[in-house]
Amino acid sequence: MIGDSLNPLADAVRRSKVEWIGVRHEEGAALAAAGQAKLTGQLAVCAGTTGPGSNHLVAGLYEACRDHAPVLALSGDMPRKFHGTDYIQTTEPDLLFRDVSLYTETIASAAQAGPVIHQAMAAAYAGPGVAHLTLPQDVLATKAEGSVASIATLRPRPEFAANEHDVAELARRIDAVDRIVIMCGAGCRGAIEELQKLSDRLKAPLVHSFRGKELMAYDDPRWMGGLGIIGTRPVYEAVRDCELLLMVGTDYLIPTSCPTKER
């Protein structure tokens, strides 16, 4: 959302091919960026101006933080000559954004901009999660020179295969029980066929986390529904009574919704 401290950025965007989407509130901008990042897996960017403008971003950015969506948040700031003077709308953005972000930094010079922006984007992808940059107005108005690092290497996290010991241990645990439930999250995107085959092989129903609810058609016979606040009683009982809960593509953990008996 535009504001005085972001005017140099808005002018640069106006002269580029970058699309600027206006919103009515900074929290809405952060939520929209989080939604885009979750749907595409690609970095999304939002911005807020000095003081209350950037403060409002924080609430929406927790959506990206908790759901591990790659988002770059930009905070406009007063010119550097006013730092430390109790100037109007003075805040400490780096402190404010520390809890919600994986990376937060202030760009103090035009020469620093390229490397720091690249590092922030890399951090957002590596999490994935939120990276934050504070942009003083006078720095934004300064022409940056020199080469800019390529973004060709910036990608969502690579895939990793489990080591042989972990695979063998998982197989041992599966063989030792009869009642298995598979809980699916957003990390299962792109592997639905494999998930269905696993369900058939183990004769295990599929339940989903909040972000996994769109993975499969609701009339799929393997699909029981959701667990947790949006869950159903049959799902809760299936998870409560299972001997092994396989969590695939999710870090979901609400103790009141998970098995309580020691197995």
Task: Put a short name on every predicted segment.
Residues M1-R263:
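N-terminal alpha/beta PP-like core and its mobile active-site loop of ThDP/TPP-dependent enzymes
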